[in-house]
């Protein structure tokens, strides 16, 4: 009887799609109003001058200028700002 025993099933073998989070425009880069600066979960980066925050905590430029990253305050929070020319 040259039969093969049936292979068992597995509970593994799936994964979620990557969400493409992270910094999209780096320090010193020129941006236009509406450009996305950072995609994040929660406020790893906080909104500084000329930067808005979306309902999913995405940071975006509200005016034209250059991107600046700063660490401020006693809690060493990271702020993203857009410096207008």
UniProtKB/Swiss-Prot annotation:
Superkingdom of origin organism: Bacteria
Record Pfam families: Ribosomal_L27
GO molecular function: structural constituent of ribosome
Record bears the keyword Flavoprotein: no
HAMAP family listed in its UniProt record: Ribosomal_bL27
Family: Belongs to the bacterial ribosomal protein bL27 family.
NCBIfam families, per database record: L27
Protein name: Large ribosomal subunit protein bL27
Organism from which the protein derives: Idiomarina loihiensis (strain ATCC BAA-735 / DSM 15497 / L2-TR)
């Amino acid at each position: 009887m040259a039969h093969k025993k049936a292979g068992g099933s597995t509970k593994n073998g799936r994964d979620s799609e990557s969400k493409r989070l992270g910094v999209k425009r780096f320090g010193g880069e020129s941006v236009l109003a509406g450009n996305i600066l950072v995609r994040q979960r929660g406020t790893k980066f906080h909104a500084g001058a000329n930067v808005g925050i979306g309902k999913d905590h995405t940071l975006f430029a509200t005016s034209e200028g250059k991107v600046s990253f700063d660490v401020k305050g006693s809690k060493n929070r990271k702020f993203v700002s857009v410096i207008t020319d």
